[in-house]
Amino acid sequence: MEFSILLVGHGSRAEQGNVEIDAFAKQWQAHHPEWQIHVCFIEFSEVLLDAGFDLAAKKSKKVIVVPLILNAAGHVKMEIPEHLAQARKRHPDVEFIYARHLGASTGILSILKRSLQKTMAKIDMPDPKTTGVIVLGRGSSDKVANGEVAKIARWLWEETQHELVDIAFTGITFPRLESAVQRQVKLGMTQICILPYYLFTGTLIERIARQFANLQSLYPQVSFSLGKYFGFEPEIYAALDERVLELVDAKQEHMMECDGCHYRQIAQEHGHGHQH
């Protein structure tokens, strides 16, 4: 075939997270039976980046590498490009093209708005004036990645009637969920919707569920509602379709900026190669 696709998931210590990504890839393949879609993971899997690149390279002379990742932090900017560079050396006759990550987009915003609607429906008195919203991201040492969470939260505020839409992170950076909830309670919110900004399940989703239960006990006067991670939403498939189709002709302007970037080497020399 003309090209093959390598879908790169993050990987999770929780086996179900990787199972969901495999199932997602099978559904995407069903949408496009003429494509060859392979899956690998950055970590916590038997099939990691090098094995994924080698497998895809055996199937065609053009491989489109698609990161199934919301925010461009260390894995997207550093780790995948590093392994991609090595794959090009191992397979000099194969053209590898690195697609853009998902990022903040109108499609992702649509998913987040639906999640908010569903969480509001679980609240006894769904009044946006008294219901705070917290968009809960993974957290990164990369300010641009954290900024994407802030951007999507701002977009959500722009398109809803909620007076208070905050961001929080499960790790690496701040504010954390508990601090964001404390702030909203002090500002008079009697109901709080927490929206995980995650694609699939994993250990962090499990941690969020425990934090949610703890918050309910700490603030019995507040009605909390927890949204689901994004999962198998049609907008995710549509975004990946766009990533592939814009690269079929290998147009430079649609490639991931970090592929071949000389600043990546500088960052590696300063010890910033593997960070979320």
Sequence positions of predicted segments:
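Active-site-proximal alpha-helix that buttresses catalytic centers in soluble enzyme cores
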Residues: 1-276
